[in-house]
């Protein structure tokens, strides 16, 4: 059965490649004709293609010629000609699919083909990378092709102001990170004026390292938040009592599910220490939450594995890359609980203002495509969640890397000793070795062992920056030993013998040249009129010639030694991450090899491996230093990985099912908010709101009765005066209503409310009133949406308990979320009407600056991943967020 499915998938892929080959032949047939064009004729192709699109030609019809033009432009500007397999990858991306291309096959260059073709429509193309360094590098490097062909290139990175962002989004091709694109979408949907918005429509996105962004980061919510008014003392109080609890008596820990729970004895002990009668009483809900988070912080969150303490701050370690995630924070008070545990200053909790997950953000694009070296293992998830097919593109040259079988040891100590011994043997020969670890803790342990043996090496496990890319680029040099967390330096090729261009640029930096001069001097086309650039160019060429002589000799020797050798010190939960590590070797037909070392004490085997395994090995009498070669071990390893992959897929699918409910609500609110922001006249909307509020007020106080004498007339008049009839003649109204039927009352009060509304319009003037209406509506919607997000979050946290009452939690969540959404809409209408009839016009305030500080939160692996947070504070002189029209310091901020 499984073999049949696999055969079908392979057959499908072979059919795809055959079709793609025919399109590649059509592109290649145009090459002589395109090569014969002058630079100006080649550049004139862009306006010609645009005219042809206007006349009705499709992008698919333009594809062969457009791809041929990009290939020729790349050859002239960068000195790089797209291979046939790169053309195939480009076609797949244009079709809105995922191209799986092995490491070193030039994915960065592939993206230029569909990006150019789709940019011809004028609707914009977003190329999404995993970090600012790659976005900046690719926009400068590949940007030369687009600029040569007359397209504008934009770059979205952290630190740009609104005008710079708008300009970057208005470019034909925009490079940026997934976080920046997502945050700009959220900020645009919090804008109070159309000119504050920066993004255009979400037309076409090409996601580089698509598996990292759409799978690994899938559960990461992007969150814009403001400071919540919550005290921090309770965190310290609770942190002090947790160490006094005893494991397995007062609490139990399930590492596999990543859950820690108090036993009945533990609850009683905590209640006694905190001086409360019932920890789970309604009045103590917040206290119970503090206790649960503190327990998690002390038992499940490990220092130097999940986080580090640096300069008095708790900094999260990315579980996939091992990098320090500066600015990210765990959510729901977990980060504060860890800060209390470690005795550092506690930062205040935040309140969510706007949020979206990457899953839902990227599904909003009209067309989505991606590329990666490893996607086939997650093909089912890409298809089910994102409706994306995966096409495996063949390598340009045959893959000759040797992947050796895993070596399994009984203990971690025995495993690491064997790893160090293999590194020593290969280093002694001069063969470069790249060692992948899964945590900072493990990489530092291995580094200490290598130091004791006198083996020189580089360790990479910090925040991504250019230096890391350079070290990774030189990891193929003779005798190099590099220890890196599994994905550090992703996006940078390891060239056997070393990278001569990088070595030459390093020499120029040492000589004191600025980054701008280095970039100008190393370009294919140089400004010959600039003497400083020409002098730098001369130095670069000398350094490059010397570096080439050095690296060519090293390349020859490294190839003879078998190329780069990869050592994995532990199997990751996902086979895909293991394949990424392996993929660092054997690029572009180079030789290479890989081997994984595993111990039965590794988390994967300990938590998900076969329970029978240890007993069998005990009976066999295996010692720590003897590798285990048994089919049961290999089988157990593979089953453990499949088990975890299936478990993680189920979690992501489950999260999406819940998030889809919120997503539909978000789409409605943001769509209507955008209409208010950009629409010419919102008077009809306001009139509808007034009529709805009048009708709801009558229904609330009249109930089912048709007769006024049975109504709560005093309540009705109080509410009407409060909302839409300020300063009304209550006695006259009461007398009039007593003589009417219920249906007449609706019409009577509507007319009275509209009369008061028209009076407001005369007082303030139509133009002023429209602007006031717009601001009130936006402010009220934002405030209510913020409260709704908190309420939905609380509903979500507690909904799982419905299963105990034989209720499907998802069905219950959908039903209650729908009710809450309707209540929010009614509340928005009431508040808008109330403010509208009472607002006073004050002098306009200076436009407030956007103060946005990045601050991310993350949940444990079984819940949502680390949300990426950005915060902003209301300035004392800003308009108050409540919509009153007063300054914050004279309204809700009084006395603060």
Swiss-Prot record:
Binding site for Zn(2+): 880, 882, 891-892
Main location: membrane
CDD domains (UniProt xref): DEXDc_SecA (cd17928), SF2_C_secA (cd18803)
EC top class, as a word: translocase
GO MF terms, alphabetically ordered: ATP binding; metal ion binding; protein-exporting ATPase activity
Domain of life: Bacteria
Catalytically driven reaction(s): ATP + H2O + cellular proteinSide 1 = ADP + phosphate + cellular proteinSide 2
This protein's UniProt keywords: ATP-binding, Cell membrane, Cytoplasm, Membrane, Metal-binding, Nucleotide-binding, Protein transport, Translocase, Translocation, Transport, Zinc
Cofactor binding: number and manner: May bind 1 zinc ion per subunit.
Protein name: Protein translocase subunit SecA
Native source organism of the sequence: Moorella thermoacetica (strain ATCC 39073 / JCM 9320)
């Amino acid at each position: 059965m499984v073999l049949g499915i696999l055969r079908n998938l392979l057959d499908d892929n072979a059919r795809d490649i055959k079709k793609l080959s025919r399109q590649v032949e059509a592109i290649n047939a145009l090459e002589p004709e395109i090569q014969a064009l002058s630079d100006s004729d080649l550049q004139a192709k862009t306006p010609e293609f645009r005219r042809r699109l206007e006349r009705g030609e499709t992008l698919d019809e333009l594809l062969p010629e457009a791809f041929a033009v990009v290939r020729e432009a790349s050859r002239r500007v960068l000195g790089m000609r797209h291979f046939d397999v790169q053309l195939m990858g480009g076609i797949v991306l244009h079709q809105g699919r995922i191209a799986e291309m092995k490491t070193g096959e030039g994915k960065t260059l592939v993206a230029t083909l569909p990006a150019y073709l789709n940019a011809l429509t004028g609707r914009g193309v977003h190329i999404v990378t995993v970090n600012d360094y790659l976005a900046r590098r690719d926009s400068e490097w590949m940007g030369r092709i687009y600029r040569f062909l007359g397209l504008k290139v934009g770059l979205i990175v952290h630190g740009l102001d609104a005008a710079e962002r708008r300009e970057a989004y208005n470019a034909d091709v925009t490079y940026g990170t997934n976080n920046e694109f997502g945050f700009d979408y959220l900020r645009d949907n919090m804008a109070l004026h159309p000119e504050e918005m920066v993004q255009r429509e979400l037309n076409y996105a090409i996601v580089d390292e698509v598996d990292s962004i759409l799978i690994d980061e899938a559960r990461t919510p992007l969150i814009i938040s403001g400071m919540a008014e919550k005290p921090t003392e309770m965190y310290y109080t609770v942190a002090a009592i947790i160490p006094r609890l005893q494991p397995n008596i007062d609490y139990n820990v399930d590492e596999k599910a990543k859950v820690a729970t108090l036993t009945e004895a533990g609850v009683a002990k905590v209640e006694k220490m905190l001086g409360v009668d019932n920890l789970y009483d309604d009045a103590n809900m917040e206290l119970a939450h503090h206790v649960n988070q503190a327990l998690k912080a002390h038992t499940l969150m490990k220092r130097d594995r999940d986080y580090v303490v640096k300069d008095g701050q708790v900094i999260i370690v990315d579980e996939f890359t091992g990098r320090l995630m500066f600015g990210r924070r765990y959510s729901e008070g977990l980060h504060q609980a860890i800060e209390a545990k470690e005795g550092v200053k506690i930062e205040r909790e935040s309140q969510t203002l706007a949020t979206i997950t990457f899953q839902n953000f990227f599904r909003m694009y009209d067309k989505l495509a991606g590329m990666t070296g490893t996607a086939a293992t997650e093909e089912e998830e890409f298809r089910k969640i994102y409706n994306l097919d995966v096409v495996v593109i063949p390598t340009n040259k045959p893959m000759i890397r040797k992947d050796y079988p895993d070596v399994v040891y009984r203990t971690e100590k025995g495993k690491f000793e064997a790893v160090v011994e293999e590194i020593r043997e290969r280093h002694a020969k001069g063969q470069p070795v790249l060692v992948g670890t899964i945590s900072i803790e493990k990489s530092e342990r291995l580094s200490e062992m290598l130091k004791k043996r006198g083996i020189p090496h580089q360790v990479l496990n910090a925040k991504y920056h250019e230096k890391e890319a350079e070290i990774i680029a030189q990891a193929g040099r003779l005798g190099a030993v590099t220890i890196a967390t599994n994905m550090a330096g992703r996006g940078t090729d390891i060239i056997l013998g070393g990278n001569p261009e990088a070595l030459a640029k390093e020499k120029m930096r040492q000589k004191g040249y600025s980054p701008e001069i280095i970039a100008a001097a190393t370009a294919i086309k140089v400004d010959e009129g600039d003497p400083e650039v020409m002098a730098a160019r001369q130095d670069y060429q000398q350094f490059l010639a010397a570096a080439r002589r050095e690296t060519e000799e090293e390349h020859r020797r490294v190839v003879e030694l078998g190329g780069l050798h990869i050592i994995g010190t532990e199997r990751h939960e996902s086979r895909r991450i293991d394949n990424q590590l392996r993929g660092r070797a054997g690029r572009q037909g180079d030789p290479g090899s890989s081997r994984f070392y595993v111990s039965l004490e590794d988390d994967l085997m300990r938590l998900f491996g076969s329970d029978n395994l240890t007993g069998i090995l005990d009976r066999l009498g295996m010692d720590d230093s003897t590798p285990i070669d048994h089919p049961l071990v290999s089988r157990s390893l593979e089953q453990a990985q499949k088990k975890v992959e299936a478990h993680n897929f189920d979690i992501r699918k489950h999260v999406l099912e819940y998030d889809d409910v919120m997503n539909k609500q978000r789409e409605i609110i943001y769509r209507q908010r955008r209409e208010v922001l950009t629409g010419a006249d919102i008077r009809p909307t306001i009139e509808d709101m007034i009529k709805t509020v009048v009708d709801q007020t009558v229904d609330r106080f009249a109930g089912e009765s048709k007769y006024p004498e049975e109504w709560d007339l005093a309540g009705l008049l109080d509410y009407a005066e409060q909302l839409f009839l300020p300063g009304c003649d209550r006695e006259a109204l009461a007398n009039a209503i007593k003589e009417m039927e219920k249906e007449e009352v609706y019409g009577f009060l509507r007319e009275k409310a509209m009369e008061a509304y028209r009076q407001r319009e005369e007082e303030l003037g139509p133009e002023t009133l429209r602007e006031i209406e717009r601001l009130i509506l936006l402010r009220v919607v934002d405030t209510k949406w913020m409260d709704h997000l908190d309420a939905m979050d609380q509903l979500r946290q507690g909904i799982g308990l419905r299963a105990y009452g034989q209720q499907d939690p998802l069905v219950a969540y959908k039903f209650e979320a729908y009710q809450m959404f309707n209540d929010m809409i009614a509340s928005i209408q009431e508040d808008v009407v109330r403010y509208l009839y009472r607002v006073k016009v004050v002098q306009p305030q200076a436009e407030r600056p956007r103060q946005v500080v990045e601050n991310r939160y993350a949940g444990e692996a079984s819940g949502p991943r680390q949300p990426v947070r950005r915060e902003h504070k209301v300035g004392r002189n800003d308009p108050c967020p409540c919509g009153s029209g007063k300054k914050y310091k004279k309204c809700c901020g009084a006395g603060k």
